[in-house]
Amino acid sequence: VVEDNIRFYSSILPTLYKFVLQQSLEFATEALNTSLEMLRMRGRPKIVLARNYEEAWLLYNRFADNTLGVISDCRFPITEGGEKDETAGHKLFSAIRERDPHVPLILNSSEADKAQLAKECHASFIDKNSKKMDVDLRDHLRDHFGFGDFILRNPDTMEEVARLRNLKDLQDNIFKL
């Protein structure tokens, strides 16, 4: 998460923690025994916070191979204590895209016209002023960050072939696929 506004990150972080914990609990229930359950709980995704571009880039480089996705504001300082840059989020996402064209990115802003910047770097956009921002965020996390059901699609038509909720579903359907 890249955000310099304490009021916003104070509200978004609990939402993210709750979502990740809920997903971890669901994942842990598939464990064969208590030890595996605890191991799966400890292996849940970590959420890191950056307040400027430099910090965000350092964190991204540190965790790039294990990054599920990046959520960023559009406007924040490039350096600690520096002036806010109107397009810092776009600059960050452009740099990330050069390194990894597939990592999910979410650009959020209270300015709806910034949605165009999100499109330019193939990112999703969430309006901070939306009354259902929490729901939009959860939906994007579930659909693009690797949470939720595993959906198998026909590569030609993109039609859903199968939806697997857990390993049991995979076992039950493996020969049908």
Model-derived regions, located:
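A short, hydrophobic beta-strand element within the central beta-sheet of small alpha/beta folds
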Residues: 68-72, 90-127
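Conserved acidic segment of CheY-like receiver
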Residues: 1-7, 12-36, 49
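Short, flexible/disordered intra-domain loops and linkers
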Residues: 11-14, 78-88
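CheY-like receiver
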Residues: 1-14, 59-62, 136, 138-140, 145-177
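Short acidic-hydrophobic, aromatic-tinged amphipathic segments that line or gate anion-handling sites
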Residues: 48-51, 125-129
